[in-house]
Structures are given as C-alpha cells and as structure tokens.
C-alpha cells in the first residue's frame, strides 16, 4: 500500500510529522540552553570543557545571532509572545524580531489571518523596546 505524501507548507503550519509534538526555540532560547549545559559540564569537570569545532561554531553563532543576550531578556520575550501564536510562529517572531507587521507577515505567512496589523505591531514594538534596553 503506498504511503501518503505529506506536503510541507510553513504558511499553513504544516511542518512535517517530525515537528508535530516538538517544542521550537528561538535562537536566544537555544543559546541559554547551550550555556546552561556548558556551565553544568564545567562544574562537573572542574572547569575543563572539551569543545568540538562544531560546538565552538554553534556557540559563536548563538553569540552573534541571538537577539536577546541575557536569560532575563529571553524570558521577557517569551512573556511578550505568550501563547497567542503557534510554537513555530513564536520561535520565528522571537528570532527574527521584525521591525513592522508587514515584514513579519512576509517572513511568517501563517500570521496572515491570525492577528491584525495593529496588535502585531504592538507586539513587535514591545520586542524592539526589550532589545534596546536589555542588560
């Protein structure tokens, strides 16, 4: 019997079966997760953490592209985004930090009929303010 073909479409939040029950992180959340794991390993090995080239590059990537640099700012971002969005949309909004609603809708098409421009812009403005005033 032929298997059904799953048509992926991020605009409709059809991300594939492997993503159905998984959480999605912003780059800032992933940065905190990696930092926490590395700190735990440092405590367990008296400060000596063997880092592969991949891990070094991953940490460097997070340091460059994480929009929220501290745990406090990242948690504040989570609070701003709340549960209004699908986990994929939340991760994208928190990672991309779009300047305006039009940009957000272009980059995250699934937002099209979910929230009006005024409310979306308000959320984006809160994220922008948070980025400016993070520690």
Curated annotation (Swiss-Prot):
Pfam families: RNA_pol_Rpb4 (PF03874). It is found in: Nucleus. Its main location: nucleus. One of its GO terms (molecular function) is translation initiation factor binding. One of its GO terms (cellular component) is nucleus. GO terms for biological process: transcription by RNA polymerase II; transcription initiation at RNA polymerase II promoter. The keyword Nucleus applies. Keywords: DNA-directed RNA polymerase, Nucleus, Transcription. DNA-dependent RNA polymerase catalyzes the transcription of DNA into RNA using the four ribonucleoside triphosphates as substrates. Component of RNA polymerase II which synthesizes mRNA precursors and many functional non-coding RNAs. Pol II is the central component of the basal RNA polymerase II transcription machinery. It is composed of mobile elements that move relative to each other. RPB4 is part of a subcomplex with RPB7 that binds to a pocket formed by RPB1, RPB2 and RPB6 at the base of the clamp element. Component of the RNA polymerase II (Pol II) complex consisting of 12 subunits. RPB4 and RPB7 form a Pol II subcomplex. This is DNA-directed RNA polymerase II subunit rpb4. It comes from Schizosaccharomyces pombe (strain 972 / ATCC 24843). The lineage of its organism: Eukaryota, Fungi, Dikarya, Ascomycota, Taphrinomycotina.
């Amino acid at each position: 019997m032929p298997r059904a073909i799953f048509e992926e479409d991020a605009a409709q939040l059809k991300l594939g079966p492997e993503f159905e029950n998984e959480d999605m992180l912003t780059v800032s959340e992933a940065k905190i997760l990696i930092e926490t794991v590395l700190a735990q390993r440092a405590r367990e090995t008296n400060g000596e953490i063997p880092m592969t080239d991949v891990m070094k590059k991953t940490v460097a990537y997070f340091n460059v592209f994480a929009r929220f640099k501290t745990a406090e700012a990242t948690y504040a971002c989570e609070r701003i985004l709340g549960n209004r969005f699908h986990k994929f949309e939340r991760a994208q909004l928190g990672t991309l930090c779009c300047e305006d609603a039009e940009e957000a809708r272009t980059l995250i098409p699934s937002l099209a009929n979910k929230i009006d421009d005024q409310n979306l812009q308000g959320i984006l403005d809160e994220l922008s303010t948070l980025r400016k005033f993070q520690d």
